[in-house]
Regions:
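Extended alpha-helical interface modules used as scaffolds for assembling large macromolecular complexes
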Residues: 1-155, 159-161, 191-193
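Domain-level recognition of nuclease-like catalytic cores that cleave nucleotide substrates
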Residues: 165-193
Length: 193
């Protein structure tokens, strides 16, 4: 009931051949999703990953990670704190087909918390790469502590981005320096430098 109509951003583009089939499919899919309380999670995740790689839309991607972390973290996970936040972020970014996430990438200036290394050998038209500096504050930490971690993350991300090893790895993409600060399981800072 679908026809292949070309390619778009390394994906096969499928179209519905006519209006009658379109209405039948749409009604069937919508009814099925409502009856079974299903979500579009894998589709949305793929769309967010594509937006990150091709359009530089980083904020929705990290908001998605924060939402998943908040939704799926158990009490035991919350007790692990920083280790859980870092591990969860790495696990989600590892599912992104356009990047190889490198945790604590060594640069001449220290260790980048998370470097999203673009897979340019496979996806030649990716135009964005990312350094993510993650910071964690305990749930009871003050706003002053959050600001201190934010400034520390800015300093580190700027330093790492200028290193020779990072510059070689990102060519020819545009490097985004992202800082993320969590207070407990809540993302309180997410900004680009």
């Amino acid at each position: 009931m679908l026809a292949i109509s070309g390619m778009h951003k390394e994906e096969t583009k499928l179209t519905i051949p006519n209006q009658v089939v379109r209405e039948q499919l749409f009604a069937y899919i919508l009814d099925t999703y409502h009856e079974n309380d299903l979500t579009f999670d894998s589709y949305e995740k793929r769309k967010l990953a594509s937006g990150l790689a091709y359009d530089g839309k980083w904020k929705p991607y990290f908001e998605y990670i924060a939402g998943c972390l908040h939704r799926y973290a158990s009490q035991r996970d919350k007790q692990k704190g920083e280790y859980f936040v870092h591990g969860f972020t790495l696990a989600i970014t590892a599912q992104n087909p356009f990047y190889r996430p490198v945790f604590e990438k060594d640069s001449q200036e220290g260790y980048v918390d998370l470097f999203l290394h673009p897979l340019l050998d496979i996806y030649k038209d990716i135009s964005h790469s990312y350094i993510i500096e993650l910071k964690y504050a305990k749930g009871k930490d003050s706003s002053e502590r959050i600001e201190q971690l934010r400034r520390q993350a800015i300093e580190q991300a700027e330093r790492y981005a200028s290193s020779e090893s990072v510059q070689k790895a990102i060519s020819p993409t545009m490097l985004h320096k992202i800082i993320v600060v969590y207070r407990g399981m809540e993302m309180v800072v997410c900004e680009e430098l």
